[in-house]
C-alpha cells in the first residue's frame, strides 16, 4: 500500500527553492563586491570569502566572473547571513539619512538664494549659531552670480557654510 502523506518530502526543499536561495546568495555576493574595503572589514565574513571578494574584481570576462560569483555564492552558504543583512541594512539606512540630510541642506541653500529675509529668519531660528552677517554676504554673492549666469562658486560656499553649521549643531564637529 502507498502512503499518501509523503512524509519523507515534508522537510526537504524543492530544487527550485534551492536554486532561488543560491541565486540570492550570488546576488548578495555581487553586492558585497561593490563595497569598499573598510566597509567589508566591518562585516562578519570568513577569510576565504574576503579573499574571494577581493579577487572578484580581477575577473572581467563574463564567463569567468559568473563562475567566480557562483564560487562566492557557495562560500556565502556558511556565513551568518542575518548579521550581514543587518549590517547592510544599517549602512543603507545611514546612507539614506545622509542623503536626506544633504537634500535638506540643498533646499535651504536654494531657499536662501532665491528667497527673502523671511527664509533667512527661519534658517537662523533653526540654526541659532549662524553668523547672520557672513551668511547674508554669502547669499548676496550667490544671488549676484546667479543674476549674471556665472558658475555657482558662491552658492557652493553658501552650501558649505550651511553644512558646517548643521554638523556643528548635530555635534559632528
Curated annotation (Swiss-Prot):
Primary residence: cytoplasm
InterPro entries cross-referenced by the UniProt entry: DarP (IPR006839), DarP_sf (IPR023153)
Biological process annotations from GO: assembly of large subunit precursor of preribosome
GO cellular component, one term: cytosol
Gene3D superfamilies membership: PSPTO4464-like domains
Molecular function as annotated in GO: ribosome binding; rRNA binding
Transmembrane spans: none
Keyword check for Zinc: no
Source taxon at top rank: Bacteria
Annotated compartments: Cytoplasm
Protein purpose: Member of a network of 50S ribosomal subunit biogenesis factors which assembles along the 30S-50S interface, preventing incorrect 23S rRNA structures from forming. Promotes peptidyl transferase center (PTC) maturation.
Family the UniProt entry places it in: Belongs to the DarP family.
Protein name: Dual-action ribosomal maturation protein DarP
Gene this chain is encoded by: darP
Amino acid at each position: 500500500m502507498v502512503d499518501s502523506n509523503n512524509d519523507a518530502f515534508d522537510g526537504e526543499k524543492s530544487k527550485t527553492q534551492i536554486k532561488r536561495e543560491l541565486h540570492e546568495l550570488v546576488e548578495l555576493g555581487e553586492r558585497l563586491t561593490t563595497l569598499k574595503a573598510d566597509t567589508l572589514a566591518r562585516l562578519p565574513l570568513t577569510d576565504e570569502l574576503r579573499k574571494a571578494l577581493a579577487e572578484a574584481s580581477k575577473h572581467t570576462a563574463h564567463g569567468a566572473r559568473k563562475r567566480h560569483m557562483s564560487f562566492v555564492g557557495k562560500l556565502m552558504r556558511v556565513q551568518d547571513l542575518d548579521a550581514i543583512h543587518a549590517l547592510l541594512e544599517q549602512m543603507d539606512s545611514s546612507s539614506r539619512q545622509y542623503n536626506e540630510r544633504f537634500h535638506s541642506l540643498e533646499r535651504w541653500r536654494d531657499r536662501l538664494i532665491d528667497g527673502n529675509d523671511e527664509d533667512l529668519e527661519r534658517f537662523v531660528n533653526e540654526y541659532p549659531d549662524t553668523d547672520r552677517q557672513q551668511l547674508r554676504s554669502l547669499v548676496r554673492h550667490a544671488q549676484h552670480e546667479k543674476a549674471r549666469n556665472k558658475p555657482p562658486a558662491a552658492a557652493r560656499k553658501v552650501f558649505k557654510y550651511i553644512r558646517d553649521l548643521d554638523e556643528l549643531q548635530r555635534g559632528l564637529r
